[in-house]
Amino acid sequence: VFSVFGGTYNRTVSANLGMSYSICNVLKESGTDNIGRWLPFEMDPFEMRNRLRNKMIRPTTIPQTYEDLLIEQAVSREALRLAFYHHKSLARSLKGTQQQRDVGQIFEQAGGGETLIKMMDLDMIIGSGGVLSHAPKRAQSALMMMDAYEPEGITMLTVDSIFMMPHLGVLSEHFFDAARQVFEYDCIVKCGHCIAPVGQAKPGEVAITVSGDGVSESVKVGEIKVIPAGRGEFRELGEFRELTVTPSRGLDIGAGKGKAVTQKFEGGTVGIIIDARGRPLNLSPDVKERVGKNREWLEAMGLPLP
């Protein structure tokens, strides 16, 4: 996980979390319940463990059915969530005024200062790696990032088109301008802006309204709604439109609780995604209710049901 907040660059590596040889590490760290909570169908924990262990011993296999794909994407949500939690725990400010660090101080002060990761200040998330880059639909990549990272406020969701960022990093050491151009025009694929209010409200109440330039939408608490790039004024990808986003009284999208924000938005390949599920994201403990919600959110993103 790489991040830049307030001009401070941080990098962490969670080498034990992956989707091939180390997929069972994700299973061990998160458990079957946490993986199963992202599935739009009920699954026996024993069957889930068997499927993931088969993936571990045959790491080059790809999902053969839509159900297999949904299971793999559920595991990826947990891998991303755990890696991000690890990153937040290490990306912290130092205690006091001490700035010089040696190895010992890094471990002593790892839990000392506040985390540098402020999701409300984040402008863009770039998802890279096999599961995100090679998902059959970009909306699947966007939903995985929304579930795992829980972006707050207004955030542009993007993916690495064909998992080329590591190669561009090497290329940039010798041909910086060429690498930058490829990065901007061929690597980064914009899924669209995600609008996610922070806070909790009663289910069924209107959480957020979006208006301006031919768009008028109201989204209730617990719902996801997508304004497609081809609808209304969003006729072309990469085209910006100025919209006003107004959260309900107890919710915040960056300007304060209940305060509206007016800015330019970009639809991207998915559209403008309004995520009114609340932050932090709380899923129902009832299995049937949770499965129903997952199916509802898949449909809202324009994705097929299993």
Q: What is the predicted function of each stretch?
A:
Residues 2-306:
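Helical "lid/coupling" subdomains associated with nucleotide-phosphate turnover
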